[in-house]
Amino acid sequence: FSESFGEEAGAHFTSRDIIYLMTDLLLSDADLSKGGNVTVYDMAMGTSQMLSCMEERIQELNTEIGVTCFGQEFNPSTFAIAKADMTIRGGDPNNMRFGDTLSEDQFSGYQFQYIISNPPFGIDWKREKTAVEAEAKKGELGRFAPGLPKISDGQQLFVLNGLSKLAPNGKMAIIQNGSPLFSGDAGSGPSEIRRYILENDWLDAIVQLGTDMFMNTGIS
């Protein structure tokens, strides 16, 4: 399965070990004893396995909690699988939406308690350039006010998308390669995005994964 889809531009499949690490980090200090409902969002959901693992972990902590999952995906094949999987699991398939997250945001105005995602590594955003730049000009009304990364790597755009959708006291776990940590000179778009994250105290931790964790990629 991963050989069929994983080599498409920047696409890669995430092992369950990594997903469970992310879910456990997100839920490490969560108070879920009171029940209720929580929302989970994946901006590049693939086949929605991160969403299903997050739901599983939350309900292991408290079976009385309702979990509502939301996701967006641009690959038609994996989107179809995600929507079918959500239906089988008894969720709302209408919360699984098709489209390019950077240029066709299907969840504008939404806020989520948990965001978990593994968006594409090092893929350019030339196709989305017009839409992204137009949204950046909206300032605080858009997702990309803090700055724009270099055109050759859109990873930081996904980070900004996630931050724009966090509910108060919400948490996000996102996988990136090393580029967003170091790219760009002082005062450049990538640098200003990092400044925005740090000055607003958005960053709790950076976890370095081992090598060869992603199939069908040269990512170490």
Question: Predicted regions: what is each one?
Answer:
Residues H12-S117, G122-E133, Q176-S179, A186-I193, ...:
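Conserved S-adenosyl-L-methionine
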Residues F1-S2:
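Long recognition/docking surfaces used for binding and targeting
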Residues F79, L148-I219:
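Conserved Class I SAM-dependent methyltransferase catalytic core
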Residues F121-D124, E128, A134-S152:
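Conserved catalytic motifs of ABC-family nucleotide-binding domains
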Residues E8-R16, G147-S152:
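Short acidic-aromatic active-site loops that bind/stabilize oxyanions
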